Amino acid sequence: MTPSILGHLDRLADEHPDKLLYSYLDVNGDPIESYTYASFLQRVEAIAGHLWKEGRFAGGDRLLLAYPPGLEMICAFFGCVRAGLIPVPVYPPSSRGFQSALYKMVHIAKDCQAAGILTSRDYQASLKTNLARSGVSACGIDVDYISGLPWMATEEFVTPIAGRPAAAHSKVLFLQYTSGSTMEPKGVIVTHENILDTCPLVIDHSSPVVISWLPQYHDMGLIGCYLYPALKGGTTYGFSPTDFIQRPILWFDAMTAYRATATAAPNFAYDYCLRAGRLSKESLEACDLSSLRVLMC
């Protein structure tokens, strides 16, 4: 039988259904969206059911995930997996660097032969606005390609769908594309087995508590901060990269408040926090990071 990360999550949900799995925080550190193990899998099942009900996709089809920061992208990721589809996380083009990001998104959609795009209502509306303002049609970007794909806002997929047949799990969990900063983005196959084998090498303790502001379309954020903790029966508290830049003390406050055992960030983030005026002596004195066991960079 093909190993599946969902099999592990199903078992953990049976063992402690009411344990907190994911919580997303606002800029003040207050939770704005949360899921227990049981409620998360219920949502995943609902998304999978609606993807199956649409009848547009076959097992193994690739779906782009284009979401703003939040838990909806994580729900959609697992919903694809439950439905036997292959999620492809992408950076959602926004007003800053719009044309470059849009070019990469179109390239990825073509390269993986995406069958559709999952997103949120708000992001889809903002993308249309940015498209109208940017004049990308004159820049050689094939917008018609992604416009011709089915777009689905997964917030609407909340009710269970009865009668959905069990999907056959592919060995492929998802496709992770490189950033494309120096050349065209290239897709890397990530399997269920890859994640299951490497998880204990990165997080060596049970029930980890992870704090993350990392982008969820990035491998360090998605794998290290949302997949690994879930497979270890842990809890992830996430917040937006923008909120970290605006208020870096939020990272330290969250690690203190929730007794984080693990976190992750690239080198620039630590340099950013050390710059004069970013963090006051008084705010740091109130922090307690003694619970940390793993710090990835």
Regions found by a protein language model. Name each.
Residues 25, 67, 88-107, 121-123, ...:
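ATP-dependent adenylate-forming carboxylate-activation enzymes
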